[in-house]
């Protein structure tokens, strides 16, 4: 069954709030058995923060052809950490080739969380909580106020042919952030934003990232980990056939300098191209962005990490950096056929190792310090 938001009173003028209409149409589709399509035709639809909650009786596909636009007025979204949220939905599909415009420039100056611990979080553009067996495809997210996409407590989700865009200096605009979720695929997509292209927090398991172009941004990151007690492990990440262009980091694992105990293991990074990337390969167990962290050794154990066929150019002299914990050294780190060059003023490309155990095979440029 097709549910056209225009027939329920949606106004595609870019100024009228359509959140009640969208809520009503989703509820109708959700309570209908079989396959149901929510159609959002061409046009620009202003939308206040909305939660679309299951479980649903049948399958729901949100087919977005037009543009959804967030509110500019922050007084109406203060302390609301989402814009569009899907919860407890199974077999959800988002498709259509449309666009989500978070209107980030109206709020980025208010993003003070990196400096102010009492800050009010800005809205994440698209949140998925407890969503299963779902696909997000052929969509564009631009200028999120905070992260573009957040995936929490989800299972068996596929993101493909997604375009994520924000300026490189936009604060905290992570592309896709994953936590407490398993069997998540991110395929055939382009992410160009102001923070991590993809980031994984505790409880991320069996994550597959393939054929993704990242840049600008901060790279693909695991962490920061160890920030709280009883964190779930990160287990099973595969990143293949990806390209990084001008990013602040490439493949990064980071843990807090003085952390609680947890583990990160079974990570594989293969067939990666670096184009003028700072820190192409980095493990940082002294992570402290505020420079005001408690001193001590990280208690996060990093092991079974494989890097294979990583090639291209580094914008930093140190192209491979393993700064592991003295208390919990990195174990079973494997480097296979690394070819990274540096053409800056600091001299020959180099690697740096601290508290790491592993093996290097095949070509190694820079020369391996393992």
Where are these regions (language model features)?
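Extracellular/periplasmic carbohydrate-active domains that bind, remodel
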Residues: 1-370
């Amino acid at each position: 069954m097709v549910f056209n938001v225009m027939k329920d009173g949606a106004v595609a003028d870019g100024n009228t709030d359509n959140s009640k209409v969208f809520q009503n149409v989703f509820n109708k589709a959700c309570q209908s058995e079989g396959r149901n399509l929510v159609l959002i035709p061409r046009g620009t639809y202003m939308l206040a923060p909305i939660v679309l909650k299951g479980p649903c009786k049948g399958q729901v596909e949100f087919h977005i052809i037009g543009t959804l636009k967030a509110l500019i007025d922050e007084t109406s979204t203060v302390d609301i950490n989402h814009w569009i949220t899907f919860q407890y939905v199974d077999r959800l599909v988002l498709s259509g080739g449309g666009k989500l415009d978070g209107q980030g420039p109206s709020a980025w100056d208010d993003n003070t969380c990196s400096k102010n611990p009492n800050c009010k979080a800005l809205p994440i553009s698209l949140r998925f909580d407890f969503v299963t067996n779902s696909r997000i495809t052929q969509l564009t997210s631009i200028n999120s106020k905070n992260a573009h996409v957040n995936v929490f407590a989800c299972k068996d989700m596929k993101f493909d042919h997604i375009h994520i865009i924000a300026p490189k200096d936009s604060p905290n605009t992570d592309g896709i952030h994953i936590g407490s979720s398993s069997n998540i695929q991110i395929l055939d997509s382009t992410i160009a934003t102001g923070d991590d292209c993809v980031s994984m927090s505790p409880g991320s398991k069996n994550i597959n990232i393939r054929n993704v172009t990242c840049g600008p941004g901060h790279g693909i990151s695991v962490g920061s980990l160890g920030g709280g007690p009883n964190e779930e492990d990160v287990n099973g990440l595969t990143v293949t056939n990806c390209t990084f262009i001008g990013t602040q980091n490439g493949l990064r694992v980071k843990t807090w300098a003085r952390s609680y105990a947890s583990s990160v293991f079974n990570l594989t990074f293969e067939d990666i191209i670096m184009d003028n990337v700072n820190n192409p390969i980095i493990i940082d167990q002294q992570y402290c962005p505020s420079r005001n962290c408690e001193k001590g050794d990280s208690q996060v154990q990093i092991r079974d990490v494989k890097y294979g066929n990583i090639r291209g150019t580094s914008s930093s002299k140190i192209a491979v950096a393993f700064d592991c914990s003295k208390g919990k050294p990195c174990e079973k780190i494997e480097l296979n056929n690394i070819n990274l060059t540096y053409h800056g003023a600091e001299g020959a490309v180099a690697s740096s190792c601290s508290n790491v155990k592993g093996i290097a095979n095949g070509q190694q440029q820079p020369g391996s310090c393992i």
